[in-house]
């Protein structure tokens, strides 16, 4: 191992004074030649955990990542720091790939990023056997989990690394894994001897908000108005909805782009490039598509449909606020989402074991959505973590929800489901309860039922909330044959007979005051007196990014520019003391940064 201590390298190359959280322990453990399994939330600084030991040890650090779209930016960010980094994946032409292979064999690389399918070829394994390797880093390690939402079969074969190079340390990293998945990762990757480093999964800078669907398009555009000119992601269930949402947002004056697997490759690539390199783009994407977005200044992630699981939700919302600045995770969901997801589970070709797992994951997520306690406490409990007190940064903490005794409305709703034959959807059931005289109610003879018009005391919106919460609590289930009808469950009987009382959450009516508060509370906080200098620095960064054809954040994060604007360094020595500026960036960009600070006074 090289004699350069980790701290010296951290300051000299990366420009940071100190490691964060468990980073130092992980770096020293791996640099000493030991295996590690690292669970750390997005934005926690996972990449430093393998980059620093790779630079401390002799040889090249081999980073295995499934996110091809990310590799180019990750490598460019390292080059900006003066690190000799390259990547090998299917996007490179033969000539470039051959050059990278020559540099690998000649010992001219510090870091090499490679896709798992490329790594596992006989040709590449042969190249590695002729190279000096510092370590193997297996990123996105949850991809090895068969039950996970990102399963990649090639990850199962990565045990070959330990079989062929037992003396080379391996570090596997993931930002999302509940305790069973953690055990599966260790087992499948042959990391029995690895030390586990498990950080808190909390992302304190993200505010969590859940709203009930009630004109979803208007709710989304109202939410986005509090994030004008900020970058964000809007997740939708289907490709069609992605495109419709992007079109709608454009008509509302937002700079929105679509992104899903059905778009032509060049359109996808161009939209992703624009999202990464331009400010204030809203990317509308499918939940199923892993975008591999490493943009640090994503200020919000909005879900217009319910994700399938807590892990999926955590991973998708985790793309917000990677720079540590305030960000928002906003979820808009209604009964229709629940009906659709439950039908998808029942109609799938999966085994009964798999279906049961999917059901419990969905029920867990519904519990989060309907909970009246701190969102953060519920979210983290799903990862086996206890959060000690209410967080003060979620909708339930900021505006505690009211509860109401819904026992009688619940009995009326369940009775109406039973008496109408357990095969009708919510819209029709509400019409019956509220005494509607429409054609369908009369045609079915439901105006003659004892439950007809017994629910006129509640409006349709409240009845939708009652039915939604009954389904979420498994007191009603969705007809899996595809018609979306509701029927009773075994648990319904206790409510109907009065043995079980029902308390429900009273849905909040969205108000603009809440949006204004939201606008004040999230986003990058720059003091008014620093704004002109901050914007001038962003202008220089945009110019440098265009010249080099790289995303702006690869050159400097917003938070670094804000620190410069606050501290106003007028010499290179003073600039060197601002966090996030390593030696290479200081010599490369320092004079121009200092010049702008002096000009702006």
Predicted features along the sequence, with ranges:
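Helicase motor core with emphasis on the C-terminal RecA-like subdomain
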Residues: 2-13, 17-21, 25-37, 41-47, ...
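Flexible coil/turn residues that form the inter-helical turn or adjacent wing/linker of helix-turn-helix
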Residues: 166, 228, 372, 422, ...
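Short, charged low-complexity linear segments at domain edges
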Residues: 353-385
